[in-house]
């Protein structure tokens, strides 16, 4: 009955071997699907800047065997892989798999960095643009944008702060559809205090990341309905998924 839909267990921030994840798309689908708990996941592999220093270091370490991001000439194949696995996930597990990407800006000047997820992405989006341009391009595709770990600041040399969207929220909040209020094991209480539309995600890269913050969405189990519920951000809750169980 409309209005009385159950909560769906969702994770909208998942990486695979298409970027810096440990598992293939098929292995991710089987990991989430085999729990019998998940209703919706989004595969959101990185689209990187050309001069991303972390990715360049990774390519050197792997002798060029991995790109650590989805390149423009591979993007159609990436979507085809996600589409094929989405069909299998729905048939085998009753689980929706949404195509996405994390448009990733890692600069040495950390105050300029942003990581932005596009959910239900249809076309490649370059990370070489400004955050404003990326957000507008996501909206132009009728996709959903998520500000990833928006209040993550670090003083570690090998980590990247990603606070540009948060530091410029007054100018950009109308373009950001959702803000991560929780990412893996971290809670960003400042996001909820501002009453911005929120989600919670695992930022999955390896199997142990399955046990982390997730989103509960009260919605019918189809992407148009889930997308509307996320935008409305009324029947939404955070949950901590632990040892195969969750609680709102």
Predicted regions and their residues:
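An N-terminally biased module of ancient metal coordination in phosphate/nucleic-acid-related enzymes
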Residues: 1-99, 103-104, 132-135, 208
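Conserved beta-strand positions in the central sheet of alpha/beta enzyme cores
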Residues: 41-44, 146-147, 180
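Charged catalytic cores and adjacent phosphate/nucleic-acid-binding surfaces used
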Residues: 1-19, 25-30, 34, 54, ...
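Flexible loop residues that form catalytic
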Residues: 46, 150, 184
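Aromatic-lined carbohydrate-recognition surfaces of secreted/lumenal glycan-active proteins
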Residues: 144-156
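Generic beta-sheet signal
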Residues: 100, 148, 201-202
